[in-house]
């Protein structure tokens, strides 16, 4: 058994030529490294036609004579979208899905002891009769060999697949499939715990290996405990010869039990409130072609920075490296068959069914995967077709429920969970539809598979009022999905901005739907998610202020609303070192169902009128209310406030003078506002809003050590305003 990473030494042509597959090739080719995209696109104003092409890859290699009599397998992690593989001019394999892995047996075409050539005909055109193509698509699909490639040398008989069903109580079943002559062979399985303890089990090929491991630590969101299963295919020795290990396969897994009922999702018997985001697997410039480190970083951002406990892989199975990271972090994954809205003819459907099978077989050992998407996202009902997708998935994995994202009510429910794209919120009233009005079967599970960004696109450089509205919309739906009984949770649309086709987006080929931009920089709405995390130390405290407090940047110089997104116990506000007020979350207000409701800053005056105007406490409080109302309502006053002015013997000029002295900036220096997050009685984080005196930026390097390993590597560098923490 030998394994080789095969991501170097490839040659690329943007225009496929049949000469590419021949042993000798005089074509002018470009050296490339895998992962590779067929066309690097600009960040915006790109043209989707540029990556739609029939292109080719070629790699020469030497096949030593030691490989003769063995099986040589070449595995592609993903090729977008239609791939035909040749070896020494022979067509060996065709694969019609750009989102799943496939393996090609090169053995019969190899010339041992000689140079050999593998070539790939890669078709990334969008007129292919395979998912997701056939209709309009609200995302770009890119092209190329964009996931890793590997070569394995095995015996003629080998393990093709290993699958373990492992319940939270410790019961397990191990299923295997083999290739080649295996008569008389046996199986040996070993389960290794995180502590290093091992348990061995023997079995026959015809039956699953079953058993119970005592004292297991179940995989959960808080404690994502991973075990390792190693299965060996053994040919017993004869004539006094020892047993021979023909093949060995190792997978990671977790003991856990998933159940969806009318009351929600239960993981290991404990109810979980899903708080997730949808993730496209694309990035700026390179499309799908990113190394494992960046795929893993997305999972870390979702779990550690945004505080999510779940992610939906829109709208396809995604990188194994991403799923590995989700396993390690405790991030639940709702993955789905490739496609968007369109259902094609019978040829298209046959490929879609194959995609479902490949998705399940390639992802089912990941404990983070808790839900299969058995429908094309947003598509119409198709009873015959969706009966087949559900049957195919359940046959390969009876342990997980199925779902399918819909964009209409009372859809035929063949799955275990009704997943609904709820874009009903328009900024007022209920933020999500009543579950009973949407699902045809309230006895089954229900979740919101999309909401938010699509209905209120927000650019990172939009004005603060626009950015605040998006953030509060996300908060409203999160709140109402928690408050409504029977809703298992929600997946906001979406994690990050993404490139799209001309029919969608903001006219520049970008959908600005994310809580992050395309480079994973946070928008204000990211703080809605991040602030829902439970703080265990001061470093976990989030403090994000919606307003820059720069009146000169606002229409008419009229202040906008100011909200703070935080998981602290309270927030203290200071103006030029004068304490204004301390604000706590409103546990009975609009966002009361959230673990950490956003806090509206409603008082910018506090006791300043006592200190500087000589007012008694009662008069100062009444006058402060008038000034805060003027700030909130663009200098307009209610009849009640006008009556209070009379009782305080204040004229309009008096009120205007105090307004500009304590809230506005006319005639005086711009104030400095300081917001402090209070946690366990102490200020642990600070945000200061003041006119810029000097530019000071903080550089954060994600993945700072680049590793030229199985593939090329990349760092993500964020430049931002420094974070201030208050010494404790």
Q: Model-predicted segments: where are they?
A:
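Accessory carbohydrate-binding/adhesion or oligomerization-edge regions at the termini
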Residues: 1-42, 121, 194, 471-478, ...
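Accessory beta-strand-rich segments of carbohydrate-active enzymes
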Residues: 3-16, 37, 47-48, 52-159, ...
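Active-site-adjacent substrate/metal-binding segments within catalytic domains
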Residues: 38-63, 67-75, 80-87, 93-96, ...
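Extended acidic/polar, glycine-enriched regions
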Residues: 111-115, 180-259
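Substrate-binding/catalytic cleft of secreted carbohydrate-active enzymes
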Residues: 173-175, 300-304, 310-527, 532, ...
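Short S/T/G/P-enriched beta-strand
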Residues: 531-561, 567, 572, 687-715
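Single conserved hydrophobic/aromatic residue that forms the stacking wall/gate
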Residues: 718, 722-728
């Amino acid at each position: 058994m030998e394994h080789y990473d095969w991501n170097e030494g490839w040659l690329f042509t943007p225009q496929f030529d049949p000469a590419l597959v021949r042993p000798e090739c005089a074509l002018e080719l470009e050296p490339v490294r895998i992962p590779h995209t067929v066309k690097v696109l600009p960040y915006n104003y790109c043209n989707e036609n540029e990556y739609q092409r029939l292109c080719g890859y070629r790699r020469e290699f030497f096949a030593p004579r030691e490989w003769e009599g063995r099986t040589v397998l070449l595995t592609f992690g993903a090729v977008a979208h239609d791939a035909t593989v040749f070896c020494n001019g022979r067509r060996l394999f065709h694969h019609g899905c750009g989102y799943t892995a496939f393996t090609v047996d090169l053995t019969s075409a190899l010339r041992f002891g000689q140079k050999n050539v593998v070539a790939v005909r890669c078709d990334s055109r969008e007129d292919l009769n395979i998912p997701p193509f056939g209709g309009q698509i609200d995302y770009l699909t890119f092209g190329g060999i964009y996931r890793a490639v590997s070569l394995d040398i095995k015996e003629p008989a080998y393990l093709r697949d290993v699958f373990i069903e492992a319940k939270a109580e410790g019961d397990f079943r191990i299923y295997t499939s083999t290739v080649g002559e295996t008569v008389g062979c046996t199986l040996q399985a070993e389960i290794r715990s995180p502590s290093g303890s091992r348990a061995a089990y023997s079995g026959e090929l015809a039956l699953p290996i079953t058993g119970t491991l005592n004292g297991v630590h179940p995989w959960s969101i808080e404690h994502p405990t991973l075990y390792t299963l190693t299965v060996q295919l053994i040919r017993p020795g004869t004539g006094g010869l020892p047993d021979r290990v023909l093949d060995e396969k190792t997978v990671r897994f977790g003991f856990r039990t998933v159940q969806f009922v009318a009351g929600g999702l239960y993981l290991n018997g404990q109810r979980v409130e899903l708080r997730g985001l949808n993730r496209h697997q694309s990035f700026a410039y390179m499309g799908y072609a990113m190394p494992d480190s960046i795929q893993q970083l997305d999972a870390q951002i979702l779990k550690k920075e945004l505080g999510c406990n779940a992610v939906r892989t829109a709208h396809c199975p995604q990188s194994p490296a991403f799923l590995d990271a989700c396993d390690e972090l405790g991030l639940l994954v709702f993955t789905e068959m490739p496609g968007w809205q369109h259902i094609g003819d019978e040829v298209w459907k046959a490929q879609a069914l194959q995609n479902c099978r490949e998705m399940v077989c390639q992802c089912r050992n990941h404990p983070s995967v808790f839900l299969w998407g058995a429908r094309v996202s947003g598509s119409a009902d198709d009873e015959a077709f969706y009966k087949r997708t559900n049957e195919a998935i359940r046959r390969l994995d009876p342990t997980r429920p199925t779902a399918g994202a819909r964009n209409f009510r009372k859809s035929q429910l063949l799955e275990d969970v009704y997943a609904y794209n709820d874009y009903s919120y328009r900024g007022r009233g209920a933020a999500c539809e009543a579950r009973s009005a949407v699902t045809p079967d309230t006895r089954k599970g229900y979740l919101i598979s999309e909401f938010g960004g699509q209905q209120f696109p927000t650019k990172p450089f939009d004005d603060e009022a626009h950015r605040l509205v998006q953030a509060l919309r996300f908060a409203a739906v999160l709140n109402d999905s928690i408050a409504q009984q029977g809703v298992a949770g929600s997946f906001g649309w979406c994690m990050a901005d993404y490139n799209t086709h001309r029919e969608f987006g903001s006219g520049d080929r970008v959908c600005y739907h994310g809580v992050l931009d395309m480079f994973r920089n946070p928008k204000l709405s990211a703080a809605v998610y991040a602030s829902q995390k439970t703080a265990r130390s001061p470093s976990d405290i989030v403090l994000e202020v919606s307003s820059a407090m720069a009146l000169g940047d606002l229409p008419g110089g009229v202040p906008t609303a100011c909200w703070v997104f935080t998981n602290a116990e309270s927030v203290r506000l200071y103006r030029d070192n004068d304490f204004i007020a301390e604000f706590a979350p409103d546990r009975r207000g609009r966002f009361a169902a959230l673990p950490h409701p956003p806090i509206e800053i409603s008082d910018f005056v506090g006791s300043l009128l006592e200190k500087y105007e000589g007012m008694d406490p009662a008069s100062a409080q009444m006058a402060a209310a008038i000034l805060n109302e003027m700030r909130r309502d663009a200098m307009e006053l209610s009849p009640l406030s006008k009556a209070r002015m009379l009782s305080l013997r204040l004229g309009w000029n008096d009120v205007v003078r105090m307004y500009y002295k304590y809230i506005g900036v006319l005639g005086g220096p711009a104030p400095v506002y300081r917001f402090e997050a209070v946690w366990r009685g102490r200020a642990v984080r600070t945000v200061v809003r003041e006119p810029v005196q000097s530019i000071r930026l903080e550089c954060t390097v994600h993945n700072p050590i680049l590793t030229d390993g199985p593939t090329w590597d990349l760092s993500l560098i964020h430049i931002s305003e420094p974070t201030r923490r208050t010494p404790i």
